[in-house]
Structures are given as C-alpha cells and as structure tokens.
Amino acid sequence: KKEKEQGCYGDFIECLKLYDKEENGTMMLAELQHALLALGESLDDEQVETLFADCMDPEDDEGFIPYSQFVQRLMSDPVVFD
C-alpha cells in the first residue's frame, strides 16, 4: 500500500481511544485483539498472536495493556507475514 493509505500513528491512536473506557491510555487485551481482527487488516488469530508476542507489553493485573507503546513498536518495526 502507499504510505498515505497506511495511516499514521495518530490515526491508529484515535481509533484505539474508542475502546479506552477509562481514558487512561490502556485497553483490555481482548478488546485490542477484537479491534485488530474486526477493523484492521485481514489477520487470523495466529497472526494477531504473533503481533502481540513481538510488540506487546505484558498485561497489568486487571488485564489492561498500554496501546500507544504497541502502536509505536508495530510502526517502527512492522511484522511481515508471508
């Protein structure tokens, strides 16, 4: 895709803020997985798990993750699927 079509960091953060019920920069891991599967590229469960393993900070005690770090890592070192 052309860079213009891929979106930028701010675009991704704005989309994920829709799931940020506490408005504190975190969301449930399951919600992030749902957003990636439903709204983003056509990814299967295995590809999402690979993304999480490569780009995700651990969940906190309540199951929340900081999504801005995830997006930063994903954009700085994209995961390529065959």
UniProtKB/Swiss-Prot annotation:
GO terms for biological process: mesoderm development. Keywords: Motor protein, Muscle protein, Myosin, Repeat. One of its GO terms (cellular component) is muscle myosin complex. Residues 7-42 form the EF-hand domain. GO terms for molecular function: calcium ion binding. PANTHER family: MYOSIN LIGHT CHAIN 1, 3, MYOSIN LIGHT CHAIN ALKALI. Myosin is a hexamer of 2 heavy chains and 4 light chains. This is Myosin light chain alkali. The gene is Mlc1.
